[in-house]
């Protein structure tokens, strides 16, 4: 069975590239520029969520991950934070993310991080 990934990014081009690459790697991907898939996490049941810290909406990606990790229903879903911020490692640790991907990222590194956490 395919591993499920939810991608939430702030940039459509990056979202499309990540979506295409991960689907080619055999993942079942739900990709969005909004947090809509996170709100349906019980239906999607992803193995990993990859969320950009600067997503559109009222919350930052780190806040979304922190909420997922503090909810007993979703705390076991792996979460990866992405950002261009130099403080990304600390942000990821603070929100209890399982991993992080610094932007701009190397495609192979992104694949490795998602595979490791899925």
Model-derived segments and spans:
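Two-component/phosphorelay signaling modules centered on CheY-like receiver
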Residues: 11-30
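Alpha4 helix (beta4-alpha4-beta5 surface) of REC/receiver domains from two-component response regulators
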Residues: 63, 85-102
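Conserved acidic carboxylate
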Residues: 9, 83
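His-Asp phosphorelay/catalytic-motif detector in bacterial-type signaling
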Residues: 47, 72-78
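Hydrophobic alpha-helical motif in two-component signaling modules
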Residues: 41, 50, 64-65, 74
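Conserved phosphotransfer microenvironments
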Residues: 51-68
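C-terminal output helix
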Residues: 105-114
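Acidic, metal-coordinating helix/loop segments flanking the phosphotransfer/catalytic sites
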Residues: 31-48, 56
């Amino acid at each position: 069975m395919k591993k499920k990934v939810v991608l939430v990014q702030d940039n459509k081009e990056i979202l499309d590239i990540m979506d295409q690459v991960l689907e080619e790697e055999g993942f079942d991907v739900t990709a969005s520029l909004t947090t809509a898939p996170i709100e349906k996490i019980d239906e999607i049941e992803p193995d990993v969520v990859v969320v950009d810290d600067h997503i559109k909406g009222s919350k930052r990606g780190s806040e979304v991950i922190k909420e997922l990790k503090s909810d007993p229903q979703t705390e076991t879903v792996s979460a990866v934070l992405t950002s261009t911020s130099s403080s990304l490692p600390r942000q990821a640790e603070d929100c209890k993310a399982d991993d992080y991907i610094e932007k701009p990222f190397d495609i192979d590194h992104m694949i490795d991080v998602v595979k490791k956490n899925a």
